[in-house]
């Protein structure tokens, strides 16, 4: 029974789009390639082919002398028929790697038959050919096709037939005619290129005629009258060739069923893995594939060299023709170094070698790593599996769509085009499968033309080729968020997901619009796989096309895959690229069909400068909680690399984070196609809306408080609320003449932002631009609220997620995203924002607390207790928050095997104790999350009514990039990862979801679905133990557990690395504080100011050497009074004004080894000299206790409070000067003194001794210990007490302690007798001889051996036991020993192995005679050494 976990068919989707351009390595010259335009025939010599011509053959004067036959068959025989799935293709090949593509000179058929005419087998004629049309007027003599790309067809490759037989059997027949005619061509390459430039206008018009002449389908009359417009797609109905005036007739395109190539010299076949070198890009892993137009994988180019058609492994599906000398067999990623070494040897100079060895850019490296990951996976497959798994499937546009889009781009370069999209749902038929629409977009840099081409007539310019971008979930995850954002886009934008429509509806809509205005919204693509027909819908809402006027204008994005840059300056022959779709997965092969549910219709607005095509991907369906059985649904097969770090985390460390908003728009991205890959998601998807907004937005958001939407016509209230409103929301027709003040500000009845109750007893937040009002009782309920002397800072200025970590500094700094409806704020990043929040603007959101749960979306609780759960971890119930239980291990209970699983013991954590709890019992279930508890485990009684767990009460939320367990429908709890909405496929974004829902990526099945917090609980390390040893767990679930564990470790490593970087960054500078110069009064404390008459006057004279100095007899200095400049007789010369003048010696903040930050002097300080004043906030005792309490709650351990008097305390924590960094010491070099300065008491620090420069400044804190807790002191002084707040030891106490310590060392000793200890034998136990022996390390074993007897060359390493302790038969522990040799036996082998001997009955083995087990010489050899310990050894009593 298959329990594979899959939630929707094709949700991941294999649909990708071909990038808009191919590699065209025209600038890559192959030195050894054969050039038929510069061979020896130009010098008058004979070509190699001329020597092989049969005697009597004469070249025809014109092509009219040749019969209209090709390869011996009439032209009407369909020998080369386009495959069904390529029927919508135009017949233009993709060009060659040498820059001389067939499209420049030939039609595809002529090119194909001229280069490799032997690749199509001859067919037997079954019916005569119809009569040929009459030949048109004669044409000039045929000349060889040149690289100038002449538009006229000057050559027809045919085979001469004589008497119904081919005149030549050589496969080079098509080339012979070319080579002979090439010998007559005398123009140089430079002249032909010059002629090409002169005739460029003529080329454009004639090229369109040439292309029309080669089209099989019958065009509509209105299209036949437009010879200068390009026709890009082939329709299904053939037509007769129209005869164009003044143009040579062209034979119809011959078609045949595709066959394998049989030409010689082919080294690689379709499905082979190779390395290819294109341009300046590194060697890239590729797979040989068949060209979608020529249907061959190799060909001979115009220079006579072989080329292979390859498709590149990357997240950009690209392909190209590559020269055979630039292709190597792929044997593994380690081969890359060999290729570099080979290229380095071939380099001509040192600079080229350095260029080869230069490290690749990070953007290109990421793409290369993805390609290597694909190639390594493909290397393990067979050729057939690789072809099935990796071959591209190409889909093209209808000609009307390309033409209509091109017309729009030419008519209006900046005007926004809007097109409404029909909404309908396709009912799947048994023999048909929906094809997911490939999301496509258009970039202004991608659709530029390489030159300003104009026709000779005064008609419009030829529309440029329309590029179709591509999108997969894997590639989208590697794109930086700056791609999906647009500066200046301020409107809220919604995502419109186009459903798959019925074929009948498509044709009905197509026929209903005769003017072609609606036809560009549909794309038909028929895959030649069985009877499955794929029909997808594509719509276009906004389009801004900017066509640069200069040829040398550079694009704003760079490229990191090899195909994206070649041909970017493009030529006339740039062709429209095909969107590519990876081959169908295993799920597509299933004949079972999943019924579809209708998807809610939504409007869509796309971003300027990018057209975002949205649609459901292959087989996507929305499923409810009651999912279908797994065996009835086919699972979308996605690459395993989706779960690997190479695939999921190619971009920045936090690629899905909202912090990507800070990325500038001028930065480079991975590929040009990525520019068009702008993700569009529902407005309810918070991050996707944010991803479309740039850094150019104003910092202050403007959102209407009534309709909760942004806009430009918002009126600000001039009152205290700082709110904005729409005129229409206020019911006003025009702006008021005077300042606008809302009704709340007029009446003073502001509602509390927490409880929403209005009244005049509310208080405003102290932050000026906030404008929120609260009841004091309401705001005190939030731990993130900060109370100050002048009021409070509301919770919207502190991150709710960071506050859970008890880091108040981290929580209160940084950019915040605030909830519009409640006092909740988060930092703008995946690590903080609650999953399921909805973005309103760049700094305003609606958090997930406001989700409206329906009756069927309640929480699904687990069937076990989160605390005990059969041996789970017991919490410390003394913590009231009880916040860590959700991160402990859990049972995973399935409906079918719950009873069986409950019998199995859990694997307890080594760091926690077990709680014995009886089986079953009542469970207390949380209403908001799946948590369940036994009431006795929480030490509470069973409450009545609804109950929420402590985590939910505290506001703890799930975050993006978090591994969780998810319960969906009837399936078991499954490991998944919470995804940022903008990182999931577009069809997943379009699924119905509400506020509070977030997408999850299921491991193992690689499916997506929207869930809410009630069905999710966190995954913790070790959860995979639940599945070990269970026979009922299928392969998919085991794979999911492995992937979840791997991903969990990756995220854990990323988080630890980020934290380490943050710690390292914070260690570079001290913690933040506000530097002040004088004390700041807080609360009721006041600063005393004395009258001049009350200030004492000293007796110092101005004529003294140092008036009022350190060594003077200044009366004020002795009484610790500072002189006043208007009272002191010394006047300005007074040296007792250090506090007022702030005469501090130079000092610097330093980082100490164990005591944090410290202060060090830069110059020498004399004893008694003023060092600094201790300044900060002056608070009273009540405020001091509140701050200490708050510090303990937030785990703050550093205090800066210094008591001046009972009601005057200086707190230098939030504000202060350099004195706050002075550390404590039990033997300090500074002391605090209270001085009276202008009538107020202030604290100064003075030197206790002479302090040299470079020494740290310290003073004794003299702390009073609160409670039993003590802080360890690390001052390192000799008299250190060991703890802060404990008095240092005096000299007398230190002397007494030293004497007591020495007295303990003088212990009484007595002599004891010891038993003699037997040492090892001094002879070998094997042979009985002495010498250099190896002794056994086993306790009480005296045996020793020669190395030679042990068959060893050197002594064994470490602890060694001799062979006597191992059984001779099985090498297990021996229990019976032969006492005359090393033979021994275990319990299983001791029977009959040993017998008593005549020598005192000692056991001996079969190698000894029981009557005389040893020889007489044995006793003369034995010398046993007995040693004993010294009897005079002293031991401690």
Curated annotation (Swiss-Prot):
Any one GO MF annotation of this record: histone H3K27 trimethyltransferase activity
UniProt enzyme class: transferase
AWS domain: residues covered: 1093-1143
Coiled-coil ranges from the UniProt annotation: 1033-1069
Main location: nucleus
Residue ranges constituting the SET domain according to the UniProt record: 1145-1262
Chemical reaction(s) catalysed: L-lysyl(4)-[histone H3] + 2 S-adenosyl-L-methionine = N(6),N(6)-dimethyl-L-lysyl(4)-[histone H3] + 2 S-adenosyl-L-homocysteine + 2 H(+); L-lysyl(27)-[histone H3] + 2 S-adenosyl-L-methionine = N(6),N(6)-dimethyl-L-lysyl(27)-[histone H3] + 2 S-adenosyl-L-homocysteine + 2 H(+)
Subcellular location: Nucleus; Chromosome
Compositional bias annotation for Basic residues: 187-201
EC number: 2.1.1.370, 2.1.1.371
Positions of transmembrane segments: none
Post-SET domain ranges (all copies): 1269-1285
Biased composition (Basic and acidic residues): 202-248, 583-595
In-chain residues carrying the UniProt-annotated modification N6-acetyllysine: 790
Listed Pro residues bias regions: 128-139
Subunit structure: Interacts with BRD4. Interacts (via KIKL motif) with BRD3 (via NET domain).
Domain notes: The KIKL motif recognizes and binds the NET domain of BRD3.
Disease (UniProt): Defects in NSD3 may be involved in non small cell lung carcinomas (NSCLC). Amplified or overexpressed in NSCLC. A chromosomal aberration involving NSD3 is found in childhood acute myeloid leukemia. Translocation t(8;11)(p11.2;p15) with NUP98.
UniProt family annotation: Belongs to the class V-like SAM-binding methyltransferase superfamily. Histone-lysine methyltransferase family. SET2 subfamily.
Name of the molecule in the record: Histone-lysine N-methyltransferase NSD3
Record organism: Homo sapiens (Human)
Gene that produces this protein: NSD3
């Amino acid at each position: 029974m298959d329990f594979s976990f899959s939630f929707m068919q094709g949700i991941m989707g294999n649909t990708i789009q071909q990038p808009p351009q191919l590699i065209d390595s025209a600038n890559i010259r192959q030195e050894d390639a054969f050039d038929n335009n510069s061979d020896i025939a130009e010098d008058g010599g004979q070509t190699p082919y001329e020597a092989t011509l049969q005697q009597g053959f004469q070249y025809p004067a014109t092509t009219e002398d040749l019969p209209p036959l090709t390869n011996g068959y009439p032209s009407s025989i369909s020998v080369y028929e386009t495959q069904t799935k390529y029927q919508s293709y135009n017949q233009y090949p993709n060009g060659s790697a040498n820059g001389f593509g067939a499209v420049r000179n030939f039609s595809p058929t002529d090119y194909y038959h001229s280069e490799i005419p032997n690749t199509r087998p001859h067919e037997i004629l079954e019916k005569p050919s119809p009569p040929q049309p009459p030949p048109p007027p004669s044409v000039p003599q045929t000349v060889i096709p040149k690289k100038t790309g002449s538009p006229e067809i000057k050559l027809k490759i045919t085979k001469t037939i004589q008497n119904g037989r081919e005149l030549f059997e050589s496969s080079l027949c098509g080339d012979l005619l070319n080579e002979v005619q090439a010998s007559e061509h005398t123009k140089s390459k430079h002249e032909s290129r010059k002629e090409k430039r002169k005739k460029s206008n003529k080329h454009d018009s004639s090229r369109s005629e040439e292309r029309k002449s080669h089209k099989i389908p019958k065009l509509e009359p209105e299209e036949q009258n437009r010879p200068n417009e390009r026709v890009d797609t082939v329709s299904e109905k053939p037509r007769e060739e129209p005869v164009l005036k003044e143009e040579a007739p062209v034979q119809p395109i011959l078609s045949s069923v595709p066959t394998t190539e049989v030409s010689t010299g082919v080294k690689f076949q379709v499905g082979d893995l190779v390395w290819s070198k294109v341009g300046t890009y590194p060697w890239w892993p590729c797979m040989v594939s068949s060209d979608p137009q020529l249907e061959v994988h190799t060909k001979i180019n115009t220079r006579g060299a072989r080329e292979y058609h390859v498709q590149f492994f990357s997240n950009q599906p690209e392909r190209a023709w590559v020269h055979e000398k630039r292709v190597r067999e792929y044997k593994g990623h380690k081969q890359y170094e060999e290729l570099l070494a080979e290229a380095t040897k071939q380099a001509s100079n040192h600079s080229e070698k350095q260029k080869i060895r230069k490290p690749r850019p990070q953007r290109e490296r990421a793409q290369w790593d993805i390609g290597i990951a694909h190639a390594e996976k493909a290397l393990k497959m067979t050729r057939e599996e690789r072809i099935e798994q990796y071959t591209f499937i190409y889909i093209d546009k209808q000609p009307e769509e390309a033409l209509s889009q091109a017309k729009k781009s030419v008519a209006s370069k900046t005007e926004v085009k809007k097109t409404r999209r029909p909404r309908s749902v396709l009912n799947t038929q048994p023999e048909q499968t929906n094809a997911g629409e490939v999301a496509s977009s258009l970039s202004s840099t991608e659709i530029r033309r390489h030159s300003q081409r104009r026709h000779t007539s005064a008609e419009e310019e030829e529309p440029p080729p329309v590029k179709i971008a591509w999108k997969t979930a894997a590639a989208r995850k590697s794109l930086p968020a700056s791609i999906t954002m647009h500066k200046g886009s301020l409107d809220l934008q919604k995502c419109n997901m186009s459903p798959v429509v019925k074929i009948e509806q498509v044709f009905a809509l197509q026929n209903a619009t005769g003017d072609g205005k609606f036809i560009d919204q549909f794309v038909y693509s028929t895959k030649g796989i069985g009877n499955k027909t794929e029909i997808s819908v594509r719509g276009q809402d906004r389009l801004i096309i900017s066509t640069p006027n200069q040829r040398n204008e550079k694009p704003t994005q760079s490229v990191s895959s090899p195909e994206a840059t070649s041909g970017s300056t493009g030529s006339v022959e740039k062709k429209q690229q095909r969107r590519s779709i990876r081959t169908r997965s295993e799920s597509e092969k299933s004949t079972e069909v999943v019924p579809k549910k209708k998807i809610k219709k939504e409007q869509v607005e796309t971003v300027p400068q990018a057209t975002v095509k949205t649609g459901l991907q292959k087989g996507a369906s929305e499923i409810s909680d009651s999912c279908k059985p797994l065996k009835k649904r086919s699972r979308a097969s996605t690459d395993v690399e989706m779960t690997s770090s190479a695939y999921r985390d190619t971009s920045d460390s936090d690629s899905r984070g909202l912090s990507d908003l800070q990325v500038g728009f001028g930065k480079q991205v991975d590929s040009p196609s990525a520019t068009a890959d702008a993700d569009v998601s529902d407005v309810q998807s918070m991050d996707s809306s944010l991803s479309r907004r740039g850094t150019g937005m104003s910092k202050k958001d403007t959102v209407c408080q009534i309709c909760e939407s942004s806009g430009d016509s918002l009126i600000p209230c001039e009152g205290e609320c700082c709110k904005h409103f729409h005129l229409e929301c206020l019911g006003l027709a025009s702006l008021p003449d005077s300042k606008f003040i809302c009704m709340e500000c007029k009446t003073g009845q502001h509602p509390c932002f927490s409880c929403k109750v209005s009244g005049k007893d509310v208080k405003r937040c102290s932050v000026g631009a906030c404008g929120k009002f609260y009841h004091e009782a309401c705001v005190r309920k939030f731990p993130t609220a900060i109370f100050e002397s002048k009021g409070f800072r509301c919770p919207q200025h502190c991150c709710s997620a960071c506050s859970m970590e008890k880091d108040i500094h981290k929580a209160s700094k940084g950019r915040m995203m605030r909830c519009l409806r409640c006092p909740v704020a988060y930092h703008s990043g995946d690590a903080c924002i609650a999953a399921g929040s909805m973005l309103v603007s760049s700094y305003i959101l609606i958090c997930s607390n406001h989700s409206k749960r329906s009756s069927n979306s309640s929480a699904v609780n687990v069937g076990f207790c989160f605390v005990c759960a059969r041996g789970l971890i017991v919490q410390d119930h003394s913590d009231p928050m009880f916040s860590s239980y959700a991160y402990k291990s859990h049972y995973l209970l399935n409906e079918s095997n719950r009873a069986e699983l409950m019998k199995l013991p859990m694997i307890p954590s080594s760091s926690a104790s077990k709680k014995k709890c009886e089986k079953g019992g009542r469970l207390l279930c949380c209403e908001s999350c799946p948590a369940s508890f036994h009431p006795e485990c929480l030490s509470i009684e069973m409450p009545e009514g609804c109950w929420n767990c402590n985590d939910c009460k505290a506001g703890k939320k799930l975050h993006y990039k978090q591994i969780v367990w998810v319960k969906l429908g009837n399936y078991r709890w499954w490991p998944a990862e919470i995804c940022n909405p903008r990182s999931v496929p577009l069809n997943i974004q379009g699924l119905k979801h509400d506020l509070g829902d977030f997408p999850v990526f299921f491991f193992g099945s690689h499916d997506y679905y929207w869930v809410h917090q009630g069905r999710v609980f966190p995954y913790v390390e070790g959860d995979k133990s639940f599945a070990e040893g269970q026979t009922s767990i299928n392969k998919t679930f085991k794979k999911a557990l492995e992937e979840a564990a791997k991903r969990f470790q990756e995220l854990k490593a990323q988080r630890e690395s980020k934290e380490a970087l943050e710690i390292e960054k914070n260690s570079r500078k001290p913690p933040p504080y506000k530097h002040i110069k004088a004390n700041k009064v807080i609360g009721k404390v006041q600063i005393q100011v004395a009258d001049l008459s009350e200030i004492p006057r000293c007796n110092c004279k101005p004529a003294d050497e140092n008036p009022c100095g350190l060594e003077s007899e200044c009366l004020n200095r002795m009484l610790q009074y500072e002189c006043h400049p208007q009272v002191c007789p010394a006047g300005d010369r007074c040296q007792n004004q250090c506090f007022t003048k702030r005469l501090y010696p130079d000092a610097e903040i330093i980082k100490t080894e164990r005591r944090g930050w410290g202060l060090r002097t830069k110059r020498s300080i004399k004893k008694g000299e003023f060092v600094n004043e201790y300044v900060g906030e002056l608070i009273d005792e009540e405020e001091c206790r509140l701050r200490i309490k708050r510090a303990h709650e937030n785990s703050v351990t550093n205090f800066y409070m210094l008591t001046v008097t009972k009601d005057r305390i200086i707190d230098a924590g939030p504000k202060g000067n350099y004195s706050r960094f002075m550390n404590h010491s039990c033997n300090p070099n500074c002391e605090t003194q209270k001085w009276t300065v202008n009538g107020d008491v202030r604290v100064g620090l003075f030197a206790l001794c002479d302090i040299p420069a470079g020494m740290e400044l310290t003073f004794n804190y003299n702390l009073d210990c609160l409670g039993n807790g003590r802080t360890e002191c690390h001052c390192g002084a000799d008299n250190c007490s060991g703890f802060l707040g404990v008095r240092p030891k005096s000299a007398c106490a230190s002397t007494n302690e030293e004497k007591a310590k020495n007295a303990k060392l003088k212990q009484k000793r007595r002599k004891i007798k010891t038993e003699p200890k037997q040492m090892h034998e001094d002879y070998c136990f094997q042979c009985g001889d002495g010498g250099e022996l190896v002794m056994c390390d086993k306790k009480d074993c005296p045996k020793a051996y020669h190395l030679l007897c042990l068959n060893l060359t050197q002594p064994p390493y470490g602890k060694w036991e001799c062979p006597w302790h191992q059984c001779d038969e099985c090498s297990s522990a021996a229990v019976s020993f032969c006492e005359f040799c090393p033979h021994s036996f275990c319990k299983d082998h001791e029977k009959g192995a040993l017998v008593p001997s005549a020598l005192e009955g000692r056991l001996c083995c079969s190698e000894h005679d029981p009557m005389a087990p040893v020889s007489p010489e044995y006793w003369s050899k034995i010398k046993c050494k007995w040693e004993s310990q010294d009897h005079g050894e002293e031991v401690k009593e």
